[in-house]
Amino acid sequence: MTPEMLLALRDPAGVPSHPLVFLVLGVLTFALHIAAVQVMLGAGALTLRGAFSASTYWRRLAAAMLTTSKIAVSVAIVLGVAPLLFVQVVYDPFWYTSNVLSAWWVIGFIGILIVGYIALYVFYWKNHDIVKEGGRGGVWMVASLALLLAVGFIVHS
């Protein structure tokens, strides 16, 4: 790709406001995204710990954390879109070029994210009554956490 082509990819209207506004909003929304990811990972780890415990207290915590983890994944996905859009506004031609060069990773992370989310729901469906019966299918929760961590590694590396 030549420099002339990169300049041609630039938006002719330019950035809609001062770039600092978009950089600050990008950092703010990324911080919110990371907070949701931390809630998701922490709730997932507590779910794994509590679901297979003999203690009723841990199982009750696991039931609550499973619901929290499920919701936190959705919140993390929604909050993860905004920083990407702010990056796209500020670094438009470079964003396009990097996505073309790493297209398989960009497309692959969406598929891995979907499979990780499905694995979380499979664990949820198998464990409607964790408190009484204990956890079942822990491999699904482990797979979900591993796949969601892989998504984070792909996107943020």
Annotate each language-model stretch with its function.
Residues G26-V27, R59-V73, H128-L148:
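Alpha-helical transmembrane segments and their helix-start/interface "positive-inside/aromatic belt" motifs
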Residues A35-A45, I112-G116:
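Hydrophobic alpha-helical transmembrane segments
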Residues L41-A62:
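Membrane-interface helix-loop junction between the first two transmembrane segments
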Residues A72-M141, V155-H156:
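Membrane-interface helix-loop-helix modules in multi-pass inner-membrane proteins
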